Amino acid sequence: MTNSNRIKLTWISFLSYALTGALVIVTGMVMGNIADYFQLPVSSMSNTFTFLNAGILISIFLNAWLMEIIPLKTQLRFGFILMVLAVAGLMFSHSLALFSAAMFVLGLVSGITMSIGTFLITQLYEGRQRGSRLLFTDSFFSMAGMIFPMVAAFLLARSIEWYWVYACIGLVYLAIFILTFGCEFPALGKHAQHSQAPVAKEKWGIGVLFLAVAALCYILGQLGFISWVPEYAKGLGMSLNDAGALVSDFWMSYMFGMWAFSFILRFFDLQRILTVLAGIAAVLMYLFITGTQAHMPWFILTLGFFSSAIYTSIITLGSQQTKVASPKLVNFILTCGTIGTMLTFVVTGPIVAHSGPQAALLTANGLYAVVFVMCFALGFVSRHRQHSSPAAH
């Protein structure tokens, strides 16, 4: 594989995470405007975003098999057509059913793209380089989470309709579409050359279950928290711009945290530092929820930084539970994380409707505590210490 081809594939991976990040994170910013557009209460409007998350979940789950049947380049190009149709549906329809369908299609497209992005990184890089590349790739999720809420606040403050936010997100996929030209993708399944000897199957072990629960609770907690921060902040008397700034601050420090931890993690045992980070994140989230308005930006900045490496470390630890990194195992943990994404508004919507945004934030805090417990318990059963040493060379 040529170096320019590897660079193109790596950038497709980066942008695939940015696309999913933009779609998922911008929800909290535009939810109120979309609720007004359809004349619905915010809590019931949030349920329709479950279609976006369901699309992401279904596509990541199915793509473990689809990648072996349909070439990756074909999937990405077909995804671009679906993206254009979905954004057009949002712009020209006033029907809630069509809005839900468009959200589902956007979820399908971003889930397929993200699973391809994750697969490409695990194929292109090995050993410790894989972990740091995955962390750097995941930082594009946060970068989109920092940029697009600011774009949304800029457009909404100027009374520009909410659907233009999704048109802007579509530009990320346009870049992916352009990169597919003149680019060779790894072949899989029936398209691949079967020269290698089959790899013996390994049992996953109970550590994978702990990591799967941690992945689900972490993503559900993180998105449950960040989706309702704008509404919570507005309830405290903050302006839309200040509320948006809290979300952007979180993702900005999350992004810087990922860059920092891609260097820091190599000096520590991954399970131990993951447990410490999960504990610190749970405490910082509690301080944000119970703290004064003046301290909120500082708590959310430090929360973003210290929680940045948690999810990627969970995935990396998962890949180290077997001697040979299993794509299905990694996909299983990714799927559990995506179930957390799908459940975000299913779980938090009724809580907000019944008890308000602060109750949703406290629920998220409880989920972070579960992540800490799972990571701590993993220390007694993890196999990463016996499997990760060869990867270091």
Curated annotation (Swiss-Prot):
Q: Give this protein's Gene Ontology molecular function annotations.
A: transmembrane transporter activity
Question: How is this protein positioned relative to the membrane?
Answer: Multi-pass membrane protein
Kindly list the GO CC terms recorded for this protein.
plasma membrane
Q: Which cysteines are joined by disulfide bonds?
A: none
**Keyword terms:** Cell inner membrane, Cell membrane, Membrane, Transmembrane, Transmembrane helix
Q: Where in the cell is it found?
A: Cell inner membrane
Entry keyword annotation includes Nucleotide-binding? no
Q: Which Pfam families match?
A: MFS_1
Q: Does the keyword Acetylation apply?
A: no
Transmembrane ranges, per UniProt, are: 11-31, 51-71, 78-98, 101-121, 134-154, 162-182, 206-226, 245-265, 273-293, 298-318, 332-352, 361-381
Q: What is its main location?
A: membrane
Q: Which domain of life is it from?
A: Bacteria
Identify the SUPFAM superfamilies for this entry: MFS general substrate transporter
The UniProt family comment states: Belongs to the major facilitator superfamily. TsgA family.
The protein here is known as: Protein TsgA
Question: Which organism does this sequence originate in?
Answer: Salmonella schwarzengrund (strain CVM19633)
